[in-house]
């Protein structure tokens, strides 16, 4: 395998800033595809000439864009205009006119889409072999299954063919392939990523997911893709705050000794115990909890009424041409026959009751930590029993979307037998950034190479989490570094965290005063304003009141939304004060305004 340029985001940024062209990366991608020599990874590989043209069209390197020139692939149940979507069923195939919302977001950010990947048909399975096109091979061990349903997307990342990929996740399809191929799998809060242009499996439970070689890369791709899509009736507005270091102390819940399941795999049990010990050493407070209610919820996904949702998604084939479907897939979805509306409501009630039992417990932790899978499944075992091993792989994944939780799967140190180690962190909806930060703690302790490559990952240098004794404040003018009023922060013990920008929801003014002009930040219609440059400072709580006294009207402190949708305290201006002010929203940067003023 070629190892010239590791395809982590950080390595690509370094390469591009040093003069490497996106065309060189495209050539490397296609060379890797040839070397891996697994024709079952892709269901639609785009022509290299087309990608070279797209790479050339990117122009000059844009250092401010984390996805500029980053290669990726998507699961073939996600639409790309003019390219067939099959969901791994030839008779279902169609050619969409529009590209899925999430894919558009990534391409607009400069990412290069290489192709569409193989999957368990109609995203029904956790094994990756339920496809009439031939199954992709596990990137690390040919004996074990690649994991599904997002098999091709997981394997492509593990081989270092691309930097990241999109899968989908209903029962664990964005996590099991990650566990089996030594990569990261991020399953976001439901509704955070648009499902427009995605073939549904269980529409009420589906989410697009992200595979990457590192936690930081997975979260960065997720942050770019995440945006509210009014065309998706299941979309929700979520915050995607910048990834920061995990707190020095955090609470983790794990399955109790009486409820944890390893299917007799002592090596897997030892691997998980080592990870728990490492978490304890890094500041985690570990508490065991009974997972029995979660297992009951997990079993309901395929054995309860939710299988009828899969029937709805495939009804035209199931009723008109059932022989067109993969036999095991047809059998699973066909089990919906006989399910009644009464069964559905009984299922809803039971899940709600169990969720009510578990919610108070889950809420006491920063995250749950589970073995990503109880044990491994070989291709031979699956051939002998197409159903049992698949169900086992969903032990720690199937309940997550039914409870509207978020999750991230992360590699740990390799097991004693050489197979990949992996754990998954799970938390309440909206805690995606928190569990990603915790996952970096485990990632830093792993000595494994990335995926199936020989690449090593540097531990990310993440900004600190704001401590409980400080207030984070956004400043946009004379209080910034190097300006006259910065001393009012520094003399109170404030610390500069980083430069950032607001969400594009603000107007920016130079307010007329008797002396020098002052900045005025005013909120306007969402998405109709400017993204204004700010600095973020942490100021001690006991000094904040004194700082507030230094702020004259028409300025004040209020809530300011940053470009990642996180919210901090910050300077705002009364709208009436802008009537005679100069609108400098086009500059959107006080430093640029002052430089222009003195030029």
Describe each PLM feature range.
Residues 1-56, 281, 451-457, 599:
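An N-terminal boundary/leader segment
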Residues 51-53, 61-131:
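Acidic/His- and Gly-rich active-site-bordering loop/insert found
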Residues 187-270, 293, 437-465:
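A short helix-breaking turn/cap at a secondary-structure junction
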């Amino acid at each position: 395998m070629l190892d010239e340029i590791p395809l982590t985001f950080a390595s690509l940024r370094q390469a591009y800033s040093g003069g490497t062209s996106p065309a060189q990366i495209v050539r490397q991608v296609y060379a890797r595809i040839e070397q891996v020599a697994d024709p079952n990874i892709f269901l639609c590989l785009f022509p290299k000439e087309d990608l070279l043209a797209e790479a050339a069209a990117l122009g000059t390197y844009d250092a401010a864009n984390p996805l500029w020139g980053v290669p990726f692939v998507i699961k073939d149940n996600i639409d790309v205009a003019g390219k067939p979507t099959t969901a791994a069923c030839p008779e279902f195939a169609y050619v969409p006119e529009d590209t899925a919302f999430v894919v558009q977001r990534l391409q607009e950010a400069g990412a290069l889409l290489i192709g569409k990947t193989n999957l368990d048909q109609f995203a029904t399975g956790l094994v990756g072999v339920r496809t009439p096109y031939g199954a992709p091979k596990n990137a690390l061990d040919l004996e074990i299954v690649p994991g599904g349903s997002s098999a091709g997307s997981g394997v492509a990342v593990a081989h270092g063919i691309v930097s990241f990929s999109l899968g989908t996740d209903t029962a664990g399809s964005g996590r099991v392939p990650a566990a089996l191929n030594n990569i990261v799998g991020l399953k976001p809060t439901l509704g955070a990523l648009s499902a427009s242009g995605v073939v549904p499996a269980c529409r009420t439970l589906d989410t697009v997911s992200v595979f990457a070689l590192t936690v930081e890369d997975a979260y960065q791709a997720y942050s770019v893709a995440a945006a509210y899509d009014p065309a998706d009736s299941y979309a929700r507005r979520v915050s995607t705050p910048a990834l920061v270091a995990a707190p020095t102390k955090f609470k983790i819940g794990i399955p109790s000794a009486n409820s944890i399941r390893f299917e007799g795999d002592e090596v897997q049990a030892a691997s998980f115990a080592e990870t728990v010990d490492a978490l304890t050493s890094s500041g985690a407070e570990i508490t065991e909890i009974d997972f029995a209610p979660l297992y009951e919820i997990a079993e309901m996904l395929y054995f309860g009424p939710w299988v009828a949702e899969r029937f709805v998604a495939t009804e035209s084939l199931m009723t008109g041409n059932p022989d067109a479907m993969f036999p095991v897939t047809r059998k699973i979805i066909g089990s919906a026959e006989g399910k009644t509306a009464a069964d559905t409501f009984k299922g809803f009630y039971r899940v709600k009751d169990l969720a009510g039992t578990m919610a108070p417990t889950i809420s006491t932790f920063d995250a749950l930590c589970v073995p990503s899978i109880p044990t491994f499944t070989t291709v031979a075992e699956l051939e002998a029993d197409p159903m049992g091993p698949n169900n086992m792989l969903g032990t720690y994944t199937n309940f997550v979307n039914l409870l509207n939780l978020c999750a991230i799967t992360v590699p740990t140190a390799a097991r004693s037998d050489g197979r990949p180690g992996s754990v998954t962190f799970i938390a309440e909806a909206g805690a995606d950034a928190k569990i990603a930060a915790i996952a970096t703690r485990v990632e830093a302790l792993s000595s494994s190479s990335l995926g199936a490559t020989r690449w090593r990952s540097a531990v990310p240098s993440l900004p600190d989490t704001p401590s409980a004794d400080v207030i984070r404040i956004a400043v946009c003018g004379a209080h910034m570094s190097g300006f006259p009023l910065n001393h009012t922060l520094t003399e109170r013990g404030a610390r500069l965290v980083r430069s950032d920008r607001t969400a594009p929801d603000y107007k920016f003014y130079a307010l007329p005063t008797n002396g020098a002009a002052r900045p005025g930040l005013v909120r306007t219609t969402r998405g109709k304003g400017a993204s204004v440059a700010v600095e973020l400072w942490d100021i001690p709580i006991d000094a904040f009141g004194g700082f507030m006294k230094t702020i004259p009207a028409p300025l004040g402190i209020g809530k300011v939304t940053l470009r990642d949708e996180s919210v901090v305290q910050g300077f705002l201006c009364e709208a009436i004060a802008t009537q005679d002010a100069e609108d400098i929203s086009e500059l959107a940067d006080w430093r640029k305004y002052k430089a222009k003023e003195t030029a």
